[in-house]
Curated annotation (Swiss-Prot):
Modified residues (O-(pantetheine 4'-phosphoryl)serine): 586
Key word Phosphoprotein present: yes
Disulphide-bridged cysteine pairs: none
Domain remarks in the Swiss-Prot or TrEMBL record: NRP synthetases are composed of discrete domains (adenylation (A), thiolation (T) or peptidyl carrier protein (PCP) and condensation (C) domains) which when grouped together are referred to as a single module. Each module is responsible for the recognition (via the A domain) and incorporation of a single amino acid into the growing peptide product. Thus, an NRP synthetase is generally composed of one or more modules and can terminate in a thioesterase domain (TE) that releases the newly synthesized peptide from the enzyme.
Superkingdom of this protein's organism: Eukaryota
Cofactors, names only: pantetheine 4'-phosphate
Family (UniProt): Belongs to the NRP synthetase family.
SUPFAM superfamilies attached to this UniProt entry: Acetyl-CoA synthetase-like, CoA-dependent acyltransferases
Organism name: Fusarium equiseti (Fusarium scirpi)
Name by which UniProt lists this protein: NRPS-like tryptophan epimerase fscC
EC assignment: 5.1.-.-
Purpose of the protein: NRPS-like tryptophan epimerase; part of the fragmented gene cluster that mediates the biosynthesis of fusarochromene, a tryptophan-derived metabolite closely related to a group of mycotoxins including fusarochromanone. Within the pathway, fscC catalyzes the first step via epimerization of L-tryptophan to provide the intermediate D-tryptophan. D-tryptophan is subsequently hydroxylated by the tryptophan 6-hydroxylase fscE to yield 6-hydroxytryptophan.
Pathway where this protein functions: Secondary metabolite biosynthesis
Encoding gene, per UniProt annotation: fscC
């Protein structure tokens, strides 16, 4: 009783100030960049409080707090309480319409905000205080002493909005006394005190954040606020801030490793049901509390400390600062006995006052003096809606809800609010929103809708028929309708309230009372089978894909090639989906590149295998071909082996046993042996490796190409009796020592068509080679011209040997692997012989359509081989629990060109490579995790493993013969499919597997386990071959069964798109409310982007390109309005990934994360009429005209309608996403969009450019030039001033002409001459011969297809260092400057003389000057399209360099 009296007599800020008086020097708030002691917090909050009072604030006036987590937020919170007002936290990232409605309900006195979100705040309300602005009136005011505002425990302290069942959120009003009572009781229980360092992790709109801040301060602890970047990686944030006390949801705690956070001593978990396994994980490592409480009970009211003896998560514990009662769910006037389930009621001083502006809902949720009240001082109770029971000891167990409220990541949501918003669109007739607790849709918000056009079925069938009716009622939801519904919800609700799945039903079942039968719908969702789930998933995918489809259709000629390669009917081709999602694979991608050449189209394999739609793929392809590198073949001259050939001889040694591949064909037209010889002669002439010879010199195997065609292959004509049979047509043994590598056999039978067999030694062919051979064979049989030859295999081997010398061993395999564990399979210590004649096979088949649905249904970018390997590891971990998972080698086609001019699309040879991947057993148990780990590993390996394989067998030669000859433990080879060989227009039919392998029984095998996966018809065939003598054979056969089960039970694969996995790991924890399906890709920003972002974070004006433009109609007619320009600009934004990119601070090592969004919501501001003479003036903007969300893109456009009918606009874009070329592209596209010209799709992936550029720079490590500071009395450590000055020096036409003449006469470029001039200036002013300065180098010379039309920051910040001593002649010095700067060109592969800017894009302390040369012509200042004219009025481009020299010659540079 005494404690309650104390609580009631104190306000929150009073308790905090008491701490400030007793411990003024102790830390109160600590962030990544600010620390406040209790004394400092008290003084700052008092100043701000007094300023609010001076503005006329009054008791319980509403003050909206809208800012990011920071120290200023804590100061603002305390100051509002000291002023006697009530603070109301709002999230600036919520939809504008929702915020506007909340502001209307709150009627705030003022909004306190920060610089970061002030624009959003000002768009919502007039009275705004930017609390962290410098200077600020409240900061400069002296601190006054005197009586504080008269506030007592019954005054309102804060208001938190929660989801409401009527479609409108509810504002819960909490008083000072209520929160103080709760905070003191709970803090004492958990041990909060001086020395506690509490993590502030929850969003401010959740009441847990109030607890993290105010309860901590009441008990004398320190509030630890991580930065945005630190919130991505919670474990480092906890360690960096030395957090020892945290309040988290079970979902957040699940991803933490107790060993990774040794400082954490107390952990409170609440907001969701606490899983038993999470209790076991944490209870022995920390003091673990299970916390329960609605917002209406001042954050929390029931708690229990968990231990190994108390692991049940639904047992929430005993009341803390409150009393609990269980009543009849239908009659709160009736108590129920202990152990009986009923509705949980909370009573006591901690209860909320009620709901803001809603007496009706307050009266229904809070009851006064029910008949069963006694002398326990609690006469007012809150009806929680939770079903629970209390045992005889007073412990509470939660058992569910009596209404339709759900919790998502700790956030309480009434599904009726979502349903009300959907029905308000008038686009549907009825709807139900559910959150299934189990089944394939577990914990996913699902919307089931019926439209006005649907015909109702039986509304309340008998219970046994419910499932059948629901399943029969499911149909596809129209993509456009789904988009409109989705957008309507985004306009009014938080992202956590947006359904993740949409299902359409012709009618919703009802109960006999006429209400929707939620119980049966929920039961049906939780028991949904795979077939229904797949149809629902695919309908979601199809509608989305269709919505994102471009208007560029595939031409019939292109469609024919696609259908031929993919083996599908044109009606089944999905142009809006990617090549992979249409059933393609890497080998089929090579075939598309090869056949594309024949019709004049050039593809890059990486583009074909990207996530781009087929429409975009063909629309952005180019009719251009790079000249093949000249490297003449020399017939008869021995040449080295390819890496895979060397691997073969390492394993088989000198036995050179037969190891062949073959194909059997049925000819449609008869052919004589003489005609066949002429056909094979053409093939062998076109493909020299089909006549190759192998021999050994000094224990080294070499190969050569005989010049003569005649006799270079063997051909036989056989006459068979009866029909063809397998034994008769068994391929012959080919000896490397005496036989040709190609054997041709023509079979004539008594009846039926001829059959042709082609048998080749594996040393000269691979699966891609067989595609080429058979395609050329079909042309030769029809007497058609064969395609032109590319680079020969001999030339490729010679170039590759040189290439291997340039590879860095540390970079070819950047992932950890483990050694093979072949000994696990040996039944005895002695190694057994691994021969082809001693093998057995375990097989299974899987439906190809179902497999594709696992990929397509996820909207992910997972490739088939990644799902195959990931599912293998999951199956292996289940079956072989007694050992670590093995390293698996994945075969690849090996035809990655490492430089322009390597054209081997039409070359026959053995190019195969293999690269190792390992998924640890602890990561393999879950299919999603296993596949993600596979992708992370696979995509980290450069060039699809080509560099690793090349280095391993050409450079890093293993001297130990035993290790060289040891087989690999596991090899997986996905052979793809040979659909183009089943076409009716071919002169033959394929009668066998193409490239089927055969070997002598005594031939050594290359691996212990060979997993061959192929597609035949509509089936995916898995064949696991292994020695018949191995141990654990029963488990191996069981592995096939489990592997198939893993795939079948996968349902629809992971929802999240597969992006660059490591950045995604960082991104996951930041955007709880953002579906990763809304994200296109994530990657680490480039060095130049990091430099710009770091600089602009210190000074927002840096690297913000501002262009002020005037758009007018040449006919004199006025433009209708600014909305036309706005719509055109949105089209431009949608067309470029760079403009849909946002940047999020990462850790200090990796810099910023670049996140590319699937959709864009550009910021478009419109102003009133403006005089034509002034485009630089300011205008008061009357509000956002865009669908602005939480995503702030790095650009905005401000539109003015001029009095003369023209449009004036200011375009502000961060330099992180554009360069000078990009600006020209954007303005030209803006004009195109205005006149409805189709925009050429920008298909760029900026991270690919970064990877290519980094690979080149890796050849030369960063150097450290000596400091070169201008003038010498300035220190580079000084930050650049905020005042920028510009001095323009214009050269006369005569001077410009003279410079051009000098350049022409002496063979130097204009840029080199300008670099020379600045070199001389620096040398003069620094009195030094060793000169360094930064300069901007263009990256558009990179050999990236289409880079000339891409928008992005295709530049790099380099440092040029040159010694001017010893250069008496200026021309010599100019040539040296030119040589040094030209060496930085990104397209060159030699060592780079200009060193890359170290320190993550910064050059502080080294140089303080930069030269940037732009080629600015008249066309970039004045543009015309039809009747429109676009003029540049002014341009700003401030850089964070003290001396920045920009040269803009109108001549080629």
């Amino acid at each position: 009783m005494l404690l309650l009296d104390i609580m009631d007599s104190h306000c929150i800020h009073t308790l905090v100030d008491q701490r400030a008086s007793s411990q003024p020097l102790e830390p109160a708030v600590e962030t990544y960049d600010v620390s406040l002691s209790y004394g400092e917090l008290s003084a700052m909050s008092s100043k701000l409080s007094q300023y609010l009072v001076s503005l006329g604030i009054y008791p319980e006036a509403k003050v909206v707090l809208m800012m990011e987590p920071c120290a200023s937020y804590v100061v603002s919170t305390i100051s509002v309480l000291k002023a006697g007002a009530t603070f109301v936290p709002l999230d600036a990232t919520q939809p504008t319409k929702r915020l506007a409605q909340l502001i209307k309900d709150i009627k705030p006195f003022i909004i306190i905000t920060s610089i970061e979100v002030q624009d959003k705040a000002r768009s919502l309300y007039d009275n705004v205080l930017v609390v962290d602005q410098t200077p600020s009136p409240w900061q400069d005011a002296p601190l006054k002493t005197g009586a504080a505002c008269h506030v007592n425990g019954s005054n309102a302290a804060y208001i938190i909005f929660t989801s409401g069942s009527t479609g409108l959120p509810k504002g819960v009003i909490i008083e000072h006394g209520a929160f103080s009572a709760s905070a003191l009781a709970r803090g004492n229980l958990t041990g909060l005190s001086l020395g506690s360092r509490v993590l502030q992790y929850a969003a401010h709109t959740f009441d847990v954040s109030v607890d993290e801040i105010l309860t901590t301060l009441i008990h004398g602890g320190c509030v630890c606020i991580p930065s945005k970047a630190d919130r991505l990686l919670l474990e480092p944030a906890i360690n960096r801030l030395q957090v020892n006390h945290a309040l988290l949801t079970p979902t957040s705690a699940k991803v933490l490793d107790p060993d990774a956070v040794p400082s954490l001593k107390t952990l409170q978990l609440g907001g969701e049901l606490l899983p038993d396994d999470l209790i076991r994980k944490w209870c022995s490592r920390v003091r673990l509390f299970n916390v329960y409480g609605p917002t209406e009970a001042s954050v929390a009211c029931i708690m229990s400390e968990k231990s190994q003896k108390n692991i049940f998560g639904n047992v929430i514990g005993f009341p803390v600062g409150s009393v609990c009662r269980i009543v009849d769910p239908d009659d709160h006037n009736q108590l129920v006995a202990p152990g009986v389930v009923g509705e949980l009621l909370i009573g006591g001083r901690i209860l909320a006052r009620g709901y803001l502006n809603d007496n009706i809902r307050t009266a229904s949720s809070f009851i006064e003096s029910p008949p069963w009240t006694s002398d326990d001082n609690a006469t007012r109770f809150y009806k929680t809606g939770d079903l629970a029971k209390i045992d005889h000891y007073g412990s509470v167990t939660i058992l569910g809800r009596k209404d339709n409220q759900v919790k998502i990541r700790g956030q309480r949501i009434n599904v009726e609010e979502i349903e009300t918003t959907l029905l308000a669109t008038h686009l549907i007739r009825n709807c139900v929103v559910e959150l299934p607790k189990k089944g394939p849709l577990a914990n996913k918000l699902v919307a089931i809708v019926s439209t006005t056009s649907d015909t109702p079925h039986c509304k309340h069938p008998p219970p046994a028929a419910f499932s059948e009716q629901l399943q029969a009622s499911v149909s596809t939801l129209d993509g456009l309708l789904r988009t409109r519904l989705h957008d309507a919800l985004q306009d009014h609700l938080t992202s956590a309230m947006i359904p993740k799945r949409w299902i359409r039903m012709t009618s919703l079942p009802e109960t006999t009372s006429g209400k929707v039968n939620r119980k049966e719908i929920r039961r049906w969702l939780e028991r949904m089978d795979a077939s229904v789930l797949q149809s629902v998933s695919l309908s979601n995918v199809e509608s989305t894909g269709s919505r994102q489809s471009t208007r560029h259709k595939i031409q019939p000629e292109h469609e024919k090639i696609l259908c031929r390669i993919l083996g599908v009917n044109p009606t089944l081709l999905k142009p809006h989906l990617s090549f992979i999602q249409n059933g393609g694979d890497s080998i089929a991608a090579i075939e598309l590149c090869r056949l594309g050449r024949e019709i004049g189209i050039s593809f890059w394999i990486s583009s074909v295998l990207s996530d781009n739609s087929l429409e975009k793929l063909f629309h952005t392809s180019k009719s251009r071909f790079t000249k093949t590198i000249a490297h003449e073949s020399q017939p008869g001259t021995p040449f080295p082996l390819s890496p895979v050939q060397r691997f073969f001889f390492d394993v088989v040694g000198n036995e050179h046993s037969s190891f062949t591949q073959y194909v059997t064909l049925q000819l449609k037209n008869r052919i004589s042996i003489a005609q066949l010889e002429r056909v094979i002669d053409r093939l062998v002439s076109a493909h020299p490796m089909l006549r190759a010879r192998f021999h050994s010199e000094n224990d080294t195997w070499l190969q050569s190409i005989p010049e003569r065609i005649s006799g270079s292959y063997s051909i036989f004509h056989h006459h068979g009796v009866g029909p063809p049979n397998h034994e008769l047509m068994q391929p012959p043994v080919l000896s490397l020592a005496s036989d040709p590598v190609l054997n041709v056999r023509l079979w004539d039978f008594d009846s039926g068509p001829q059959q042709l067999q082609l048998i080749a030694h594996h040393l000269v062919v691979d699966l891609v080679s067989w595609r080429i051979i058979l395609d050329d064979l079909s042309k030769a049989l029809r007497h058609e011209r064969l395609p032109s030859a590319g680079m020969s295999f001999q030339s490729w081997c010679a170039l590759q040997k040189e290439y291997a010398k340039t590879l860095d061993p540390k970079l070819v395999l950047p992932i950890p692997i483990i050694s093979d564990n072949c000994a696990y399979w040996y039944p005895s210590v002695a190694q057994q012989e691994n021969k082809h004649g001693m093998t057995e096979t375990s097989t299974f088949s899987f439906d190809m359509l179902t497999f594709n649905s696992l990929l397509v249904g996820s909207l992910s970018k997972t490739q088939p081989i990644e799902l195959m390997v990931g599912s293998f590891y999951t199956a292996f971990a289940k079956v072989f629990s007694d050992r670590e998972t093995p390293t698996v080698f994945v075969e690849s086609h090996g035809r990655e060109p490492w430089q322009t001019g390597i054209d081997i699309l039409q070359t026959v040879g053995w190019f195969t490579t293999a690269y190792p991947i390992h998924v640890p057993a602890q990561k393999a148990s879950d299919l999603n995790e296993s596949t993600l780990h596979t992708m992370r590993a696979r995509r980290s390996i450069p060039a699809n493993g080509h560099q690793y394989w090349c280095h391993r067998f050409l450079e890093q030669y293993e001297p130990d013969e035993r290790k060289r000859s040891a087989p690999l433990e596991f090899v997986i080879n996905f052979a793809g499919q040979f659909q183009q060989l089943s076409q009716a227009d071919l002169p033959f039919r394929v009668m066998s597997t193409v490239g089927e392998e055969t070997a002598e029984p005594q031939a050594r095998r290359l691996s212990l386990f060979d997993i061959f996966i192929s597609v035949e018809g509509d089936q995916l065939h898995f064949n696991i071959s292994f020695p018949s003598w191995v141990s654990h054979r029963d488990k191996i056969h069981h592995l096939s069964t489990v592997w198939k089960d893993v795939l079948e039970s996968a349902g629809v694969f992971s929802e999240r798109p597969v992006l660059d996995p490591e950045p995604i790991d960082m991104l996951r924890e930041l955007w709880h409310d953002c579906s990763l399906k809304d994200i296109d890709e994530v990657y680490w920003a480039s060095d130049a982007q990091n430099h710009m972002l770091n600089s602009s974070s210190r000074h927002p004006s840096f690297y913000t390109v501002v262009g002020r433009w005037r758009l007018k109609c040449n006919t004199g007619a006025p433009l209708t309005d600014a909305f036309r320009v706005q719509d055109a600009w949105k089209r431009v934004i949608t067309n470029h990934r760079a403009l849909r990119t946002i940047f999020i601070p990462g850790d200090r090592k990796c810099g910023f994360l670049a996140v590319v969004m699937e959709q864009s919501f550009p910021m478009v501001l419109t102003g009133g009429a403006s005089d034509t003479s002034d485009t630089n003036g300011t205008t008061r903007f009357f509000g956002l005209q865009s669908n602005e969300r939480a995503i702030h893109l790095p650009h905005r456009i401000i539109l003015h309608e001029s009095n003369d009918g023209s449009i004036l606009f200011s375009l502000e874009i961060s330099h992180t996403v554009i360069d000078a070329t990009s600006r020209s592209i954007l303005m030209n596209e803006l004009l195109d969009a205005l006149v409805d010209i189709d925009l050429v799709p920008d298909d760029s992936h900026y991270h690919e450019y970064i990877e290519s550029r980094d690979a080149l720079y890796a050849l030369s490590p960063p150097c450290q030039p000596p400091p070169c500071i201008f003038p010498p009395d300035l220190h580079c450590s000084d930050s650049a001033g905020s005042q920028l000055s510009t001095h323009v020096v214009e050269l006369s036409q005569t001077s410009t002409a003279n410079m051009s003449q000098i350049c022409s006469q002496h063979g130097i470029t204009m840029s080199s001459l300008l670099f020379l001039s600045w070199t001389l200036v620096l040398s003069n002013y620094t009195s030094s011969d060793d000169i360094s300065f930064a300069y901007v180098a263009s990256g558009r010379s990179m050999d990236v297809p289409g880079i000339e039309r891409f928008v992005g920051l295709y530049v790099d910040l380099l440092i040029l260092n040159i010694d001017t001593s010893g250069s008496d002649c200026l021309l010599d010095l100019a040539l040296r400057v030119q040589q040094m700067s030209a060496g930085s060109s990104l397209h060159q592969h030699n060592q780079i003389p200009a060193c890359r800017n170290p320190k993550n894009g910064r050059f502080d302390g080294q140089v303080n000057t930069m030269v940037n040369i732009r080629n600015v012509g008249i066309d970039s200042l004045r543009l015309e399209r039809h009747d429109f004219e676009l003029l540049l009025d002014s341009f700003e481009d401030p850089w964070d360099v003290r001396f920045f020299n920009t040269s803009c010659p109108f001549l080629p540079i």
